[in-house]
A protein has these predicted regions:
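Transmembrane helix-loop-helix hairpins at membrane boundaries of multipass inner-membrane proteins
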Residues: 1-7, 14-110, 185-206
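Alpha-helical multi-pass transmembrane bundles of energy-transducing inner-membrane proteins
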Residues: 27-30, 107-212
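Short conserved micro-motifs on helix faces and helix-strand junctions that flank
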Residues: 9, 71-72, 85, 115, ...
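Membrane-embedded alpha-helical segments of multi-pass membrane proteins
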Residues: 10-14, 42, 134-141
Length: 212
């Protein structure tokens, strides 16, 4: 299941890059559109297969004893992963006519696919650090989609989007370090809310401030 988990996360980005670089897909819009739809259909199948792998855990990177990029497949994550894959597939099908006149369709499609990889990574995140990393990847990868039309208005919107995102990222990073210090871990576990409630009052206050 570990290999399947890695595929489910990184397949869209890998497929998008391959389609973008394949000579036959550069000039043939119809072939490229079919390839993107096929890749997204495979991604949907992968996320559906991961529904049978609930409980799968994997550490991708150890930064410290408490801060690490780890994945944890649970029912909630599986539901959102299947939902995201379905939405992306349907969006790709309906976007063919909408984007058909666009001269930069290839560039849009590769970032479209890469953003899905970041979203799937969030769905299977096993800690606040993992969620943060994949969320910031999604933010950076979606900037080219915001400025896609390359008009002054689109560029201004992209800059504003990036500034807001960076500011939010700084606050999120501070929150992660705070919780890591008070709780000793930022790993998602059952009963996490009760754990936060039993922590020192400072951590409880921060939970109330950061929680949506």
């Amino acid at each position: 299941m570990n290999i399947l988990l890695i595929l489910a996360i990184f397949w869209p980005a890998l497929a998008g890059l391959v389609i973008f670089l394949t000579p036959g897909c550069k000039e043939n819009k119809q072939l490229r559109g079919r390839a993107v739809n096929a890749a997204l259909a495979v991604e949907l199948a992968l996320t559906l297969a991961m529904c049978m792998g609930q409980g799968t855990k994997m550490v991708l990177l150890n930064m410290t004893q408490t801060l690490r990029i780890e994945m944890n497949v649970d029912m909630t994550g599986c539901i959102f992963a299947v939902l995201m894959s379905t939405m992306w597939l349907l969006s790709s099908v309906f976007a063919r006519e909408y984007m058909g006149h666009d001269g930069n369709e290839r560039l849009y499609q590769v970032f479209f696919m890469c953003v899905l990889s970041a979203l799937i990574g969030q769905c299977y995140a096993g800690s606040m650090v993992t969620l943060y990393v994949f969320y910031e990847l999604m933010t950076l990868l979606s900037v080219p989609m915001v400025v896609h039309e390359r008009t002054p208005q689109a560029v201004a919107a992209g800059i504003k989007y990036l500034v807001y995102s960076i500011f939010g990222a700084m606050l999120g990073l501070l929150g992660i370090f705070f919780f890591s210090n008070y709780l000793g871990t930022v790993t998602f576990v059952p009963g996490g809310v009760e754990t936060a409630a039993s922590a020192p009052s400072g951590a409880t206050d921060a939970t109330a401030a950061i929680a949506p």
